């Protein structure tokens, strides 16, 4: 009996018992709205030709500092050779413009600078945290009278998120998706 009690006293404190280990607390789903823009041959300013975009996401929280996010984004990409102030390439004398549907899917790793969460299982956690992310993605652009383009991209970005309550977050992020193709425009 003594051995059993001693073994329980040694092993029980080592057992991790926390709600954050339950799969339903580690996974999140969400939606987002924002703007999408393009910087390239026919747009030298990311603030020009901004278009609305919509996204859906799934996030898996490894711990209060690290997550993996899968997201799908839909928007429009617009550009025009009119009033372009970029140097390259040499533009033809005819005006060129495009308006394409854009679908982007990306998988990124997020790193929170402060432990993020609420409740007793997140000791020392904050409701607010800045974060950075990076990963890999794929983009499909179609429409506008041009052939469809499929390309790989490298998304990087930064943001801030705030935990409204145990089940709701509010986030704001800014990201760049570096396309590995010059055919989007």
Annotate the PLM regions.
Residues 66-149:
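Gram-negative (and chloroplast) outer-membrane scaffold detector with strong preference
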Residues 102, 165-185:
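Predominantly the C-terminal beta-signal and adjacent terminal strand-loop region
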Residues 31-35, 56-60, 107-111, 134-138, ...:
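Residues on the lipid-exposed face of transmembrane beta-strands in outer-membrane beta-barrel proteins
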Residues 26, 51-53, 102-106, 129, ...:
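Transmembrane beta-barrel architecture of outer-membrane proteins
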Residues 24, 61-65, 114-116, 163-165:
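Outer-membrane beta-barrel channels and translocator barrels
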Residues 35, 41, 54-55, 60, ...:
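Outer-membrane beta-barrel domain signature
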Residues 19-61:
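Short glycine/proline- and aromatic-enriched beta-strand/turn motifs that initiate or cap beta-hairpins
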Residues 1-24:
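Bacterial Sec-dependent N-terminal signal peptides
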């Amino acid at each position: 009996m003594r051995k059993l009690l001693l073994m329980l006293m040694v092993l029980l404190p080592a057992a991790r018992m926390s709600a954050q280990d339950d799969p339903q607390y580690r996974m999140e789903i969400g939606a987002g709205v924002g703007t999408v823009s393009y910087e390239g041959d026919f747009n030298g300013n990311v603030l020009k030709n901004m278009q609305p975009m919509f996204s859906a996401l799934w996030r898996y929280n490894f711990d209060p500092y690290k997550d993996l996010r899968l997201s799908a984004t839909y928007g429009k990409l617009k550009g025009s050779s009119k009033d372009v102030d970029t140097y390259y390439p040499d533009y033809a004398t005819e005006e060129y413009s495009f308006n394409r549907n854009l679908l982007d899917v990306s998988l990124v790793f997020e790193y929170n600078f402060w432990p993020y969460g609420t409740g007793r299982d997140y000791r020392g956690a904050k409701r607010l945290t800045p974060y950075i992310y990076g990963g890999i993605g794929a983009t499909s652009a179609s429409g506008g009278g041009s052939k469809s383009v499929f390309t790989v991209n490298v998304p990087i970005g930064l943001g801030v998120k705030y935990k409204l309550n145990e089940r709701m977050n509010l986030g704001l992020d800014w990201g760049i998706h570096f396309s590995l193709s010059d055919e989007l425009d």
